Amino acid sequence: MEKKTGLIQFLSEWKCVDDQPDHNRRLHYSRFALSPLLVDQAMTIGVAIRRALLSEVEGISIISANIVGAVHEYSTLDGVRESVDEILLNLKQIVIKGAKGASITPLDHKEYRASIFAQGPGVVTAEHIKFPSSILAVDPDQSIATLLNETQLCIELFIRQGIAKQLTRTKKNHQGFFIDANFTPVQKANFSIHSVGDPKGLQQLLLLEIWTNKTLTPAEALYQAHASLLNLFHQISPPLLHKELSPSKNILNQNSDSNSLGGSSFGRVVSLETRRDSTQTNNSSIPKEIQPSVRLKSYTDTNLSIDKQMNDSVNKENLSIDELELSPRISNCLKKANINTIADLLNYTQEDLLKIKNFGRKSVEQVSLVLRKRFNMELLPTK
């Protein structure tokens, strides 16, 4: 932090504070810290980066399969334990990556073909897939089907790169059985915000956790998400800024030197007088792994979840119970009891819910847990 002509310059940097490449067989976990940030910057960056991680990072997946001898998805094959539908679900779970592991360099988006030719008895796994030389399976032991006798299993696979669950081609254009592929390599992403330095100051720290399926590292996923956001904002840059603002009022021109992006850090010049009235978030404890140059103090824990922030701007009680994302059985039981919104649900106690047909103690506990975690609401035990 450097003081210049009445202004405070904050130089924010990303640091990897925890890396677990062998978190489990199919997950790579990393935690990153970005600091120092001004108040509200951490929330803005955290929401944007998390959204980009889950929807903008490219991955490779099987998009369709042509199974020899299969008439339709619900048919069975002689000598094969699994139905065609189960085989397709197993193929959907196969995790594929570039052979060199360099997922930052995207493929050319053309369609690739792979094949399976196996003869039983035995278990057919991802190891039996004959991939093109440029791609391979992350977990070769992933099960596909079980052959009970000397039956032969022949499958032609169609593979493509994409983003999240979006695919431009339609089901009609796919050969064989369509597979609802999920391309995203990022399995989970969370962030939390912590205060650093003087409790009356304007500095915050952003902690970002990323889990990937090992097709690329969390650091590579973060790089892709960052690049995607830069490209997006470059495309939607307002064209009138430079035309309508005079040079003396053009904020972009005034701060062009301090706001330049370079490497893994960026600078931001902000007047203290204009930011002292900014809204302060509650302070939280800082993990021991992080030792930045600024002085750290421990305050009340305030992990800020995205759902909680979004729900502050809507009338939660008028939301449908579908927003609780309960199991279909629980949701149907509530709707049959004419409980269609969260407001309807809050009119019931836990004891009242137990009187609903097929609604047991575990169902009540699940509803209470979701209300508490997502909406900070409680169901009264009794009236």
Curated annotation (Swiss-Prot):
Disulphide connectivity of cysteines: none
Pfam families: RNA_pol_A_bac, RNA_pol_A_CTD, RNA_pol_L
Enzyme Commission number, as recorded: 2.7.7.6
SMART domains hit by this protein: RPOLD
Reaction equations catalysed: RNA(n) + a ribonucleoside 5'-triphosphate = RNA(n+1) + diphosphate
A Gene Ontology cellular-component term: chloroplast
Record region (Alpha C-terminal domain (alpha-CTD)): 306-383
Chain spans, region Alpha N-terminal domain (alpha-NTD): 1-240
GO biological process: DNA-templated transcription
Keywords (A to Z) from UniProt: Chloroplast, DNA-directed RNA polymerase, Nucleotidyltransferase, Plastid, Transcription, Transferase
Coiled-coil annotated spans: none
Record flagged with keyword Plastid: yes
One example GO MF annotation: protein dimerization activity
Transcription recorded as keyword: yes
Subcellular location: Plastid, Chloroplast
InterPro entries: DNA-dir_RNA_pol_insert (IPR011262), DNA-dir_RNA_pol_RpoA/D/Rpb3 (IPR011263), DNA-dir_RpoA (IPR011773), RBP11-like (IPR036603), RNAP_asu_C (IPR011260), RNApol_insert_sf (IPR036643)
Its biological purpose: DNA-dependent RNA polymerase catalyzes the transcription of DNA into RNA using the four ribonucleoside triphosphates as substrates.
Record remark on domains: The N-terminal domain is essential for RNAP assembly and basal transcription, whereas the C-terminal domain is involved in interaction with transcriptional regulators and with upstream promoter elements.
Assembly mode: In plastids the minimal PEP RNA polymerase catalytic core is composed of four subunits: alpha, beta, beta', and beta''. When a (nuclear-encoded) sigma factor is associated with the core the holoenzyme is formed, which can initiate transcription.
Family: Belongs to the RNA polymerase alpha chain family.
Protein name in the entry: DNA-directed RNA polymerase subunit alpha
Organism: Staurastrum punctulatum
Name of the coding gene: rpoA
